[in-house]
Amino acid sequence: MGQDQTKQQIEKGLQLYQANETGKALEIWQQVVERSTELPGRFRALGCLITAHSEMGKYEDMLRFAVAQSEAARQMGDPERVTEAYLNLARGHEKLCEFSEAVAYCRTCLGAEGGPLRLQFNGQVCLSMGNAFLGLSAFQKALECFEKALRYAHGNDDKMLECRVCCSLGAFYVQLKDYEKALFFPCKSAELVADYGRGWSLKYKAMSRYHMAAAYRKLGRMDDAMECCEESMKIALQHQDRPLQALCLLCFADIHRHRSDIGKALPRYESSLNIMTEIGNRLGQAHVLLNIAKCWMTEKKLDKTLGVVQKAEELADAVGNKLVLLKAHCLYETIYREMGSDQLLRDHVVKFHECMEDMELYCGLCGESIGDQNSQLQALPCSHLFHLKCLQTNGNRGCPNCKRSSVKPGYV
């Protein structure tokens, strides 16, 4: 298969994919990879396969194609294509919740040589690295990466990247319970889709709507949350986007749980958990399990609650997510308090505070915790987070966290 035929087949596959003929598109791209003698064409076909398998939630296959793409890039001796392939490797590891590996590949990308095209990749690399750090509950590092990605998006006038970064920032602030910002950023993403996204994939609209739904739910605006989530789910079903379907089912279940309808919540949690397990999203599984545990807790079924929390803890520990571990310890406290097991209760109180220390989830001005209740946060240029009200009363005195870390102990 020569250069012209390779190009024609790739374009044919893209047209089929956009028309939701996914199976036919995958078959064509696979044939290009197997039969084409032209390395740039094979590289591009592998890129199409990577994107398609990512959107379907087939992350193991995505990673396999990313490895093949990196080998093709090395054969071509093209540093920019090597960077692109390494970015896809990073994304694959991130999707499989192998966050440290994802960070390592991102750092390799940022340290690689290349021309103007590599600079365009840097924004996407920073976004992937931020998502990986968020998966590890390294909030300051995640925010630093997201802000860098946003600067690249603005500098390159890359509205698609800006849209994706805004969604990640929405997820970031949902976790830290600044629900005003958690809603602001996906709303900004939705505005970008409305203003610039006429020719974009519908996944951008679906993604922004899902993150809006998550924020609305946290704000107690259940009707708005349901409406946004239904819109997102409709697109996810239409495009066979299994990862987004799992997230929407989780959101639907959370809405029903908030409305005290455990009978409707549990089947949706189970459906979400099945998809999360199928696609290999271990962190997603842990999130679902914690919320199932809350249902059993409401029903006063402590043995069931305990079993589910233990599974969530194991998954969170395996992927290195400290925030989910903290939430698990919090649930353990409630369970053991109900059971009257004082020693086990004390053990988990200690572990809870250890997680807080590890994540540095304290305001450096007032000393109170960050992320335990809905409150407005503000980041300084160094990406350290504080309560907004504390910064407003502190004045322009610089970052107390940075000042503390720069003071070195003297010799005694």
From Swiss-Prot:
- What are the disulfide bonds? none
The record's SMART domains line, in alphabetical order, gives:
RING, TPR
Query: Where do the TPR repeats start and stop?
Result: 6-39, 83-116, 123-156, 163-196, 206-239, 246-279, 286-319
Q: Which InterPro entries match?
A: Postsynaptic (IPR001237), Postsynaptic_CS (IPR018293), RAPsyn (IPR052480), Rapsyn_myristoylation/link_N (IPR019568), TPR-like_helical_dom_sf (IPR011990), TPR_rpt (IPR019734), Znf_RING (IPR001841), Znf_RING/FYVE/PHD (IPR013083)
- Gene Ontology annotations for the cellular component aspect, listed alphabetically: cytoplasm; cytoskeleton; neuromuscular junction; postsynaptic membrane
- Could you list the residues that carry lipid attachment of the N-myristoyl glycine kind: 2
Phosphotyrosine, modified sites: 196
Entry's Gene Ontology BP terms: positive regulation of neuromuscular synaptic transmission; synaptic transmission, cholinergic
- Membrane topology, from the record: Peripheral membrane protein
Q: Which is an annotated GO molecular function term of this record?
A: acetylcholine receptor binding
- What does the UniProt entry say about where the protein is found? Cell membrane; Postsynaptic cell membrane; Cytoplasm, Cytoskeleton
One Pfam family here: Rapsyn_N
Q: Where are the zinc fingers (RING-type)?
A: 363-403
Keywords per UniProt: Cell membrane, Cytoplasm, Cytoskeleton, Lipoprotein, Membrane, Metal-binding, Myristate, Phosphoprotein, Postsynaptic cell membrane, Repeat, Synapse, TPR repeat, Zinc, Zinc-finger
Q: Which residues carry this modification: Phosphoserine?
A: 405
Q: How are the domains described in the entry?
A: A cysteine-rich region homologous to part of the regulatory domain of protein kinase C may be important in interactions of this protein with the lipid bilayer.
- Cited function: Postsynaptic protein required for clustering of nicotinic acetylcholine receptors (nAChRs) at the neuromuscular junction. It may link the receptor to the underlying postsynaptic cytoskeleton, possibly by direct association with actin or spectrin.
- Which family does the similarity line name? Belongs to the RAPsyn family.
Q: What is this protein called?
A: 43 kDa receptor-associated protein of the synapse
What is the source species?
Tetronarce californica (Pacific electric ray)
